[in-house]
């Protein structure tokens, strides 16, 4: 049921911020207010947090509003990782961050600082928790369908996240709506305190998802570049259409093996593409759009569909 709720939310919750609904407000030290709404049924209650302002202010509002959940979720995630595998040591996580730092959007860095201050949690620990997916091997799945492939012609973008449930991240779901002073408003479904993005959508109708493909035998990975989860946050701020999103992927220095699913839900430019990032000898990027059927692969075997 939780997965179904999150899927539906990605379609419509963005519009909550455009109308007045009942909820709670939390005013921070700068006078900026985070609005909190809830979607719930008999078994599940998910907070929808609307933040606004600069990246630091939005991070602070989010951290202050979800303080208890951030501490339990992110510190628990880090603790489990470090207890279960020595590769999640402080040294390894710090090394990944340091190598990627030249490529990380300063807006993400500032939001992370604000999140740590608002939630009153160690910035170092919060940063290390964000590096766990970067140095991990995992696989997910996704699909985008539109036009003749759907009953009503609308675009539907589906994303499945294959994280371990032992970390109990699923116990702390949160929907965050960002209304930045500069940049495109956007939304992401995540876990309390995790502000990198594995799926999200911006107000221009651009939707993001991925499938991991880096096997554990290739560990340790090369971190001299940008991880998709941080690149997605930049794209949410700046990508206004499918072409601009793909251009940002092409210009980025990418790391590891991934399938990146990007779709555009606007009627006039509706469509999707899959970007395939392959390593480790060298980073190779291949981008396929609808109706392109690469020889020898099973990609894009149906019209108006990428998966």
Task: Please tell me what each predicted stretch does.
Residues 1-2:
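N-terminal secretory signal peptides that target proteins for export/translocation
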């Amino acid at each position: 049921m939780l997965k179904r709720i999150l899927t539906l939310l990605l379609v419509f919750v963005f519009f909550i911020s455009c109308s007045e609904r009942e909820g709670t407000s939390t005013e921070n030290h700068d006078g900026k207010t985070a609005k909190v709404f809830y979607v719930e049924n008999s078994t599940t209650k998910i907070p929808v947090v609307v933040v606004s302002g600069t990246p630091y202010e939005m991070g602070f509002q989010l951290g202050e509003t979800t303080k208890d959940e951030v501490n339990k979720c992110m510190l628990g995630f880090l603790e489990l990782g470090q207890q279960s595998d020595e590769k999640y040591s402080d040294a390894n996580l710090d090394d990944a961050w340091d190598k990627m730092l030249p490529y990380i959007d300063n807006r993400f860095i500032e939001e992370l600082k604000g999140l740590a201050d608002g939630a009153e949690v160690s910035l170092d620990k919060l940063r290390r928790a964000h590096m766990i997916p970067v140095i991990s091997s995992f696989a997910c799945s996704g699909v985008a369908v539109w036009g003749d492939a759907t009953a009503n012609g609308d675009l539907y973008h589906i994303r499945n996240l294959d994280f371990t449930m032992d970390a109990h991240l699923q116990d702390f779901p949160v929907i965050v709506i960002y209304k930045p002073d500069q940049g495109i408003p956007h939304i992401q479904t995540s876990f309390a305190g995790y502000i990198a993005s594995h799926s999200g959508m911006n107000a221009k109708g651009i939707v993001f998802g991925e499938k991991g493909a880096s096997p554990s035998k290739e560990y340790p990975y090369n971190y001299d570049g940008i991880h998709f989860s941080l690149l997605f946050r930049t794209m949410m701020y700046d990508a206004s259409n499918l072409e601009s999103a793909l251009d940002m992927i092409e210009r980025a220095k990418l790391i590891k093996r991934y399938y990146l699913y990007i779709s555009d839900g606007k009627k006039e430019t509706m469509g999707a593409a899959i970007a395939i990032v392959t390593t480790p000898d060298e980073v190779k990027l291949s981008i396929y759009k609808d109706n392109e059927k690469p020889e020898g692969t099973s990609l894009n075997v149906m019209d108006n569909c990428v998966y």
